Swiss-Prot record:
Keywords annotated in UniProt: Antibiotic, Antimicrobial, Disulfide bond, Secreted, Signal
GO molecular function: sodium channel inhibitor activity; toxin activity
Listed Pfam families: Toxin_3 (PF00537)
CDD domains for this protein: neurotoxins_LC_scorpion
Positions of disulphide bridges: 32-82, 36-57, 43-64, 47-66
Residue span(s) of domain LCN-type CS-alpha/beta: 21-83
Signal peptide, first to last residue: 1-20
Phylogenetic placement of the source organism: Eukaryota, Metazoa, Ecdysozoa, Arthropoda, Chelicerata
Family from the record: Belongs to the long (4 C-C) scorpion toxin superfamily. Sodium channel inhibitor family.
Protein name according to UniProt: Antimicrobial peptide MeuNaTxbeta-2
Alphabetical list of InterPro entries matching this protein: LCN-type_CS_alpha_beta_dom (IPR044062), Scorpion_toxin-like (IPR003614), Scorpion_toxin-like_sf (IPR036574), Scorpion_toxinL (IPR018218), Scorpion_toxinL/defensin (IPR002061)
């Protein structure tokens, strides 16, 4: 019984790691990255609201970067549809 519980816990942790990623947050309305200048609090709120665990404003790209968010919440160059 104890082995089964341990296997289930390990499997759950692996699934959490596989489903999360790091990247720029996606504005689903425009298809663009969520922009920022210096507001880490705003980016962190967007990131946590999207299922990530920490977000910050990446100043050189002027966009919110999120760690641990689902891939569906992140901007990807391959699927870019931003018209801004």
């Amino acid at each position: 019984m104890m082995k089964t519980v341990i296997v289930l816990i390990v499997f759950s942790l692996v699934m959490i790691v596989v489903k999360s990623d790091n990247g720029y947050l996606l504005d689903k309305y425009t298809g663009c990255k969520i922009w920022c200048v210096i507001n880490n609090d705003s980016c962190n709120s967007h990131c946590i609201g999207s299922g990530g665990y920490y977000g910050y404003c990446y100043f050189w790209k002027l966009a919110c970067y999120c760690q641990g968010a689902p891939r569906s919440e992140l901007w990807h160059y391959e699927t870019n549809r931003c018209r801004a």
